[in-house]
Amino acid sequence: MDDDDELLLNFAAPDTSSVAASKNQNVKVSGGRWKDRRKLQLALQGRTKKRQPETGVNLIPVDESKRKRDSEDKVQLDSNKRSKFTESKGENGGKGDSYVSSLFTNNQPTSHLAPTSTTKELTYLPSNAPMKDATNFSGLGLNEKLSIHLTDHLRFMHPTKIQQLVIPSLISTENDLFVKAQTGSGKTLAFVLPIFHKLMRENKFKINRESGLFAIILTPTRELATQIYGVLETLTRCHHWIVPGIVIGGEKKKSEKARLRKGCNILVATPGRLADHLENTKTLDISQLRWLVLDEGDKLMELGFEDTIAQITAKIDSNSKIADTAEKWQGLPSRRINMLCSATLHSNVKKLGSIVLKDPEMISVETASVAGTVSFDETIATTTSTAPDQLIQNVVVVPPKLRLVTLDALLLKISKHSAERTIVFFSCSDSVDFHFDVFTRDGKKFKKVTDEETGEVKTVLVSPEDDENDGLLTAPQLSDNTIIYKLHGSLSQQTRASTLQSFVKDNNSYNKILFCTDVASRGLDLPNVANVIEYDPPFTIDDHLHRIGRSARLGNEGNATLFLLPGIEEGYVDGKLRVAHPREGNLRVKNYEKILQEGFAQGNIKSKDNKLGKWDIHATTWHLDVERWLLEDQASHDEAVRAFTSHIRAYATHLSSEREFFNVKLLHLGHLAKSFGLRETPKKLGKSVGNNSNYSESKKGKKEDPRKKMLRMAKMAVKSASSEFNY
């Protein structure tokens, strides 16, 4: 049989598409939208849906102008929709096609603080006002000539409560004193008047500048020293033989040495400069010193003057010759009287008291006086410091992106009133400079010129380049009758003094706004300050009390506003503020949107247009103007970067006891940079600062984390703040 039986077998070969589909059935598709993944999966499995032929109206040709836009047209449409946020398209956008974030989106809402209802408003009697139903100054034991000068020339009709307690004690006894009183209660006159009274009573040998130095008053800041010196000069008008003097950092030591050689009876000084003169000025004779007064003792310790004050007291003790001249100056104390004034009684103040005071008597408005003497080595019952009863404290919780525009709205509202004085506190000098430039764009300076025909001295407005004073400018961004001043420790002493003098000077036709750091928060008696704004939160609750103490002084009314961020900072209200503001109704929470609406609404606030959101368009336009100004001016942009980084460094220096409310790690740095008009990312801003920093070459090799760098520089700032010449 033949092997080949011609049997044919037919095998059907599988279709290539089905083989591919079977291989791809188990292929997992990932990424993209679900709809796209599903379509791809079906295609791999060979289950593509057959497209139905178009019928009906879809076959009718459409005019080109009415044609539905395809995907490319849609992209173009989206680009046009964002035209107002791009610098190259539209008038309100970013430069170089950069995207500008919106002010009113992605803002963190407030967690639990609700705006306070204003239906029930309580008013309280002033807690630091002069006692009108009490005795006059002559009744406190002051001599008649000095009392008449106070009432007739200085218009001080009645003493305050702290003056009623301190003046008789300093006149009748020779005990050391610790005085604790609210800020703005009249502590300066409380210790100055008894010293003048004693010096004026010395009749046997009339005291003049050649008699010697009898009193030294130490202050933590130059501004406070200058103010006390001004008070002494007004008192000398009733007794010209008493000569005051002043030595402070920032002045020429050669001029101070010349004044000390001529002689003075009462010397006001900052600790660093006084210690320098005690070592190097031989003509400064402290052998007859009868009074040593330390004003704002808590701030003296906070600035690190403990060792300096210890050196000063040791020098005074070693050179004292009071016993040798006791018979000559019989009307003066037979021993040196030390006095410490402070608004708080913390451990650092107690430590300073143990260094300076010996068996002191404690005088406080809350507790009158402590019988006998008080030992600072023992535990003293501390009373919580509080704000004046007549002061209204407002709290505004503002998202970080809206901080700058909310400040502008608040200042716009204030500038619409009659002439008022307002103080705005910032955390650092770089922030003061930046915000000063923002609000004084296109502003002018005041310059005194003499009329050639009449010889009359007039004040005229000139361009900023025509005058050397950099401390003030008009603010056309707010109103035509508003002047903004700036004050911080980095300015020259001449600028600081002239700025403060101009701000205090009466001028009823202008609103005056002072941008400053905490250098203006201690002891300064700035008259008629109606509003205090804490744009940056205080570093301690004591700093808060001193800041708001610039308003509501000597029984006058006052308003204060504190800016906080949403989140943990809201806990600062219940954790700290309610203790400092115990009066019901004095602590109020305000809605930032109402402030924006009042500041940027045009016409009637309650009109339909403003309710529909016109005000937020005006607010956005104003903020974008600031951003474009920074993009066009490189110097101003660099200043904004410095202000932002300095603000973060300052924020990191809050005390550990208040770190639960102010944690730098929880800040939204991008949103915060927006409030400085910056469009770069915080990482890029950190790099720009790093390029200008003075690192060693070894450290430049490794890239430093921006957050660690800010914390490191914050520690450096705290360390350098202990020097009075940097304050």
Swiss-Prot record:
Stored PROSITE patterns: HELICASE_ATP_BIND_1, HELICASE_CTER, Q_MOTIF
Annotated Gene Ontology cellular component terms: nucleolus; nucleus
One GO MF term attached to the UniProt entry: RNA helicase activity
Record-linked SMART domains: DEXDc (SM00487), DUF4217 (SM01178), HELICc (SM00490)
A Pfam family recorded for this sequence: DEAD
Compositional bias (Polar residues): 15-28, 99-119
Keywords assigned by UniProt, alphabetized: ATP-binding, Helicase, Hydrolase, Nucleotide-binding, Nucleus, Ribosome biogenesis, RNA-binding, rRNA processing
Domain of life the protein comes from: Eukaryota
Catalytic reactions of this protein: ATP + H2O = ADP + phosphate + H(+)
Location of the motif DEAD box: 295-298
Any one GO biological process: endonucleolytic cleavage in ITS1 upstream of 5.8S rRNA from tricistronic rRNA transcript (SSU-rRNA, 5.8S rRNA, LSU-rRNA)
Region listing for Disordered, in residue ranges: 14-119, 683-727
Domain Helicase C-terminal: 406-613
Miscellaneous section: Present with 1460 molecules/cell in log phase SD medium.
The protein's name: ATP-dependent RNA helicase DBP7
Originating organism: Candida albicans (strain SC5314 / ATCC MYA-2876)
